[in-house]
């Protein structure tokens, strides 16, 4: 499991309706995966690139 507790937070799309491509760490699969972020009210498990996600969570 990652040392960084942010990586264990659930994926959070948020209430807004933008479609921003982002990555999150999926603690079930143990991988960083893409999702579509709504643009507001993110949690800390939200990364602009897959590499950023991997660096934070692997």
Swiss-Prot record:
<feature type="domain" description="BPTI/Kunitz inhibitor">
    <location>
        <begin position="7"/>
        <end position="57"/>
    </location>
</feature>
<feature type="disulfide bond">
    <location>
        <begin position="7"/>
        <end position="57"/>
    </location>
</feature>
<protein>
    <recommendedName>
        <fullName>PI-actitoxin-Axm2a</fullName>
    </recommendedName>
</protein>
<feature type="disulfide bond">
    <location>
        <begin position="32"/>
        <end position="53"/>
    </location>
</feature>
<keyword id="KW-0722">Serine protease inhibitor</keyword>
<keyword id="KW-0964">Secreted</keyword>
<dbReference type="GO" id="GO:0004867">
    <property type="term" value="F:serine-type endopeptidase inhibitor activity"/>
</dbReference>
<comment type="function">
    <text>Serine protease inhibitor that is strongly active against trypsin (1900 IU/mg) and moderately active against plasmin. Also shows weak inhibition against chymotrypsin (70%), elastase (38%) and the metalloprotease thermolysin (14%).</text>
</comment>
<feature type="disulfide bond">
    <location>
        <begin position="16"/>
        <end position="40"/>
    </location>
</feature>
<dbReference type="InterPro" id="IPR050098">
    <property type="entry name" value="TFPI/VKTCI-like"/>
</dbReference>
<comment type="similarity">
    <text>Belongs to the venom Kunitz-type family. Sea anemone type 2 potassium channel toxin subfamily.</text>
</comment>
<keyword id="KW-0166">Nematocyst</keyword>
<keyword id="KW-0646">Protease inhibitor</keyword>
<feature type="site" description="Reactive bond for trypsin">
    <location>
        <begin position="17"/>
        <end position="18"/>
    </location>
</feature>
<dbReference type="Pfam" id="PF00014">
    <property type="entry name" value="Kunitz_BPTI"/>
</dbReference>
<dbReference type="InterPro" id="IPR036880">
    <property type="entry name" value="Kunitz_BPTI_sf"/>
</dbReference>
<keyword id="KW-1015">Disulfide bond</keyword>
<dbReference type="InterPro" id="IPR020901">
    <property type="entry name" value="Prtase_inh_Kunz-CS"/>
</dbReference>
<dbReference type="GO" id="GO:0005615">
    <property type="term" value="C:extracellular space"/>
</dbReference>
<dbReference type="GO" id="GO:0042151">
    <property type="term" value="C:nematocyst"/>
</dbReference>
<dbReference type="InterPro" id="IPR002223">
    <property type="entry name" value="Kunitz_BPTI"/>
</dbReference>
């Amino acid at each position: 499991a990652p040392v960084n507790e942010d990586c264990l937070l659930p994926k959070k799309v948020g209430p807004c309706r933008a479609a921003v491509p982002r990555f999150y760490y999926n603690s079930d699969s143990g991988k960083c995966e893409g999702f579509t972020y709504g643009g507001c009210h993110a949690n800390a498990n939200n990364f602009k690139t897959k590499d950023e996600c991997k660096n934070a969570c692997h």
